[in-house]
C-alpha cells in the first residue's frame, strides 16, 4: 500500500543527487545499511534519491524531535551561524548558559556538563561516579552496577557498562568495575549489592535506563525503581539514569524518571536534545556534583550552535504542547498495534513502550526477524528500526499527527500481510 504522493517529487529538488567523485566504499564498513539513499526530509517524511516519499518512524533513531527541516530550527540555527558558530569553553558562552538554565529549571538537576553524544555523556557519568566513590564513600576501586540487556554507548567504558556480551566480543579486555543484574529485578539487585558490600563500601553508582530501548523496549517498573532509589540513598550510592533515548519528551513526560516516580542524582541526555544536531549532556544534582576544573572537558561540547539547537527544541516542545501530542499519539499507536497483534497472532506477540517509543514484539519462532520486517516495510515506504532480533521499534518525530499514525499503521499492516 503506497500513496500516490509517495512517488511524487516536491519542489525543485534534484532527485538524481550524487556527490561528485563519491565512492561509497570510502566509508568504513561499520553499519548494516538498508538499500536506500535518503536525500531530503520535511516533518515526518523523507525522500530517497529516486523521488519516493517514505514515512519516517526512525527519526534518526529517536533523534529528530521536531521532524525534518523544522522551520524553527532552520531560523534559529541560521541566525546562530551568522553570529557565532564555535568558541572554546575557556570562555563564557551565552547560548550554553541559556540551555543549561532551561534544563535545570525543568528537571531535578542543579548543573549541566555538555558534550556531543550519548556515549560521551555516559562516559562523563562514569567518571563522575568513580570520583564520587573515591571522595564520598572512600572506595579504592569503585564498582558500578548496570542491567543485563542495557545499552549505554559504543565507546570503551560505555560499552563495558552495556550488559550485552555481543557488544563486548572482539574488544576485550573491557573496562573493569562493572557488574550486571536482571533489569527490574529488585531481589537480584539487592543480592548483588550485598555481595559487593559485605566487607564495606564498594559500589559507587547504579547506571540504568528508565526504559531499555536498544535492549528490546522494556519499560522500567516503578516499584523497582522506587525501592532502588531508597537503597541508593541509604548508602550514598549515586543513582544515574541514561535518558539518552527517552529524555526530552519521548515518553510523554519530559523525563523518563517522571514515569517512575523518582528523582535520580544524575542523568544523561543526547539524541532528542538537539533535534538532529550533535549534543549530549550530563545533568547532576548538588550532591553528585563532584567535578572540579580540569576533571573533565570537551572541545565541541556546549558550543553556541549545538546549544541553540537544544534550546530551540526545548522551547518548541513547550510552545507546541508536544508532550500532550506524544501521549495522545502514543496511545493511538499502541492501540493500533494491539489491533495488528490480534490480526496476525502467528507473527506478533504484543506491544510495549511509553509514548512515541513503542516496540512490536515478534514470536521467536515466527520465521521473521525484526530486521527482516524493517527491511520489508521499506517496500511500503515505511521506515522502522529493530531493537534486537524480535522487537521492531517505532520512534517517529514527536510532531507526528493522528493521520500520520494511521498511515504508519496501514503501511505496517500491508507489510505484515505480505509476510503471512
From Swiss-Prot:
Protein name from the UniProt record: Acetylornithine aminotransferase
Main location: cytoplasm
The protein's annotated pathway: Amino-acid biosynthesis; L-arginine biosynthesis; N(2)-acetyl-L-ornithine from L-glutamate: step 4/4
Gene3D superfamilies, A to Z: Aspartate Aminotransferase, domain 1, Type I PLP-dependent aspartate aminotransferase-like (Major domain)
Organism the protein comes from: Parasynechococcus marenigrum (strain WH8102)
Cofactor: pyridoxal 5'-phosphate
Modified residues (N6-(pyridoxal phosphate)lysine): 271
Record-level Gene Ontology MF annotations: identical protein binding; N2-acetyl-L-ornithine:2-oxoglutarate 5-aminotransferase activity; pyridoxal phosphate binding
Record note on quaternary structure: Homodimer.
Pfam family membership, one: Aminotran_3
